[in-house]
């Protein structure tokens, strides 16, 4: 692939730029470590990935509801009931999830050469809070699930990003950690992509539903991504 043609890099946000596994576990642990129970992190994360994908594949729900319902369904399957208030409190925790340590340096470096965009399975108000944690980096546009009323891997989210960019697909590179949500649909649409294969903080598949997409490139950190595209386009 000739990186010289790339004008825009779009990013998945949660799991790629934001450390969602540590973020969600911080608020899920009190719900599942009680009454003598201690549900393993691997089980919590894998159930999260499975249930979230099920909810997102049905009729559109705001992500706030997806998060709350996911927590409640995990509790139901673990015989540890989660109230609607506890589910809502877990949803609110997203605003506290923090960027990975390499996120801001990599984005700032990439922004010197490329336009940057976001394609995220999230509500607008949630991303508005996350955006503050990514300052001073500026994004040309942000496509949320709320705006298009669908969740990745729906092609609509990516098609809207292409439309807003004003570019052809061969001028866009998409970077993400989820094969299921991002790499597979990017491939189907002919958008070059980089799999940011961040190892899960726990053994197993982590919080993203397993997928089979074959990436154009693979890196393990955003620092590697920055080095890859910067050296190739120098």
Predicted regions and their residues:
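N-terminal helical cap/lid subdomain that shapes the substrate entry/recognition surface
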Residues: 3-101, 112, 127
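Asp-based, Mg2+/Mn2+-dependent phosphohydrolase catalytic module
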Residues: 1-9, 39-40, 81, 104, ...
């Amino acid at each position: 692939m000739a990186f010289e043609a790339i004008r825009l890099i779009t990013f998945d946000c949660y799991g790629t730029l934001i450390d969602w596994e540590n973020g969600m576990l911080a608020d899920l642990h009190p719900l599942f470590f009680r009454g003598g129970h201690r549900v393993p992190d691997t089980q919590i994360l894998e159930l999260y990935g499975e249930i979230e994908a099920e909810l997102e594949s049905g009729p559109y729900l705001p992500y706030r509801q997806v998060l709350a319902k996911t927590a409640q369904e995990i509790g139901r399957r673990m015989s540890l009931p989660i109230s609607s208030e506890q589910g809502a409190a877990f949803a609110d925790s997203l605003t506290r999830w923090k960027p990975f340590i390499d996120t801001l340096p990599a984005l700032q470096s990439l922004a010197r050469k490329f336009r940057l965009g976001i394609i995220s399975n999230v509500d607008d108000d949630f991303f508005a809070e996350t955006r503050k944690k990514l300052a001073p980096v500026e994004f040309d546009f942000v496509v949320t699930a709320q705006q298009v009323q669908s969740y990745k891997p729906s092609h609509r989210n990516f098609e809207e990003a292409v439309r807003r960019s004003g570019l052809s697909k061969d001028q866009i590179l998409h970077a993400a950690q989820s094969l299921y949500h991002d790499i597979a649909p990017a491939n189907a649409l002919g958008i070059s992509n980089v799999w940011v294969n961040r190892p899960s903080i726990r053994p197993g598949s982590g919080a993203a539903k397993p997928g089979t997409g074959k990436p154009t490139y693979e890196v393990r950190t955003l620092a590697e991504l920055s080095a890859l595209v910067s050296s190739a386009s120098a």
